[in-house]
Amino acid sequence: MGLLFAVPSFVWAMGSSLGAESTVSPSLMKLAHDRVTWFVAVLWVTGFLKLFGAALGIGLTRRRGRRIGRLMVFCGGGATVLLVWHGCLFVAHGVLVEAGALSAAPDLIGLTRWYLYLWGPWFIVGGLAFAAATTRYVRRQDARRELRLYGAVGALGALLLSLASAVTGIG
């Protein structure tokens, strides 16, 4: 699944809008269409981060060395928080728009529904999958207490990054 999740980022980074026109914000589509350098770079980096996430998910299926295990649990905790947070923001925004508590331009209502019913839940499920894989990995190790600490630090770091991003309006 992680590999499939990376495909759109690479497709869009190469200049195609396949699958994006009705599911992605028009402002982001414009940046991609205009080939804005920093945005194209973000698409490439995002694609590679998704590939890293796929490798991490696969890596969490087996015992690894002590250092690699710590790093994987740290990243697994961070990925859990980032994905669940991101998905919950999409869902919460969509629910508020659907309930009439927030307004959206009429041409964005359909897009809001994509984020509410597809993208938000997709991110949440991905985050929960990372949580399950990371928890399972930790439970099979001898140094559970130490690994839990690495996972907690990764999760806390991701939460702080997400909060800072939300407060500054960057993400």
Where do the language-model regions lie?
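Cytoplasmic juxtamembrane regions at transmembrane-helix boundaries
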Residues: 56-79, 139-161
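Hydrophobic cores of alpha-helical transmembrane segments in multi-pass inner/ER membrane proteins
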Residues: 42-56, 117-133
